[in-house]
Amino acid sequence: MGILNRRSIGIVSIALFALALFASPAAAAKKTFQDSDDAKEANEPAKFLPDYDKLTKGKDADWVYFPDGSLKKYRTVEVKEFVENGKGREARHAAEAGKEYMEQWLEKAGYKLAEKGAELVIEGNVFNAWEPGTGARIWGGWMANPGVGLEVVAKDSSGKVVGEIRHKTRGSTIDDAVENALEEVAEAISDGR
């Protein structure tokens, strides 16, 4: 083995060690909502969920917190009417569609709907809903689509919070954006992540 090969192996070994040393803490730390750009949006109130500081990056939804893990153990669910703390008629319109779409997607996920006495109670809030401006519509693209930002709290029958979700998405209309968002929220509820 020549001297050049020994140096190459040594340099590569040191580089891999340094990479492992510096990359592992960054990979181990979960990204939290409070440290994200989403938390800094001035026009998107963060006043509905009890624990914004515990939200972490989710698999199906943007930000999630499930203190006890998966919610699959709950079989019956009651969905309350959604509220809105976002500004404008778009947020009100999105909140009006929330309950129906949440029920639809939870039912598809295998939950049984109940009017009262359910094992799981879902409350929702629309913190932002928007229609793109005329310029965006002319230029097109995904950013030209309407969107919605919503939050969901899941409580057990005793009122204990068992899940919190904050999620934003887009669609061809505000209603479509609400449906898309709540489909992903229902998947997050079912998976517990």
Residue ranges of predicted features:
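Bacterial N-terminal signal peptides that target proteins for export
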Residues: 2-13
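N-terminal signal peptide c-region/cleavage motif recognized by signal peptidases
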Residues: 23-25
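A structural "domain/chain start" motif
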Residues: 27-100, 193
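Structural recognition of the beta-strand scaffold that forms the well-ordered cores
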Residues: 78-79, 162-164
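Compositionally biased, intrinsically disordered linkers/stalks adjacent to structured regions
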Residues: 174-193
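Surface-exposed short loop/turn segments
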Residues: 31, 104, 108-160, 166-168, ...
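Generic solvent-exposed, charged/amphipathic alpha-helical segments
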Residues: 99-107, 182, 186
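Bacterial N-terminal signal peptides
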Residues: 12-21
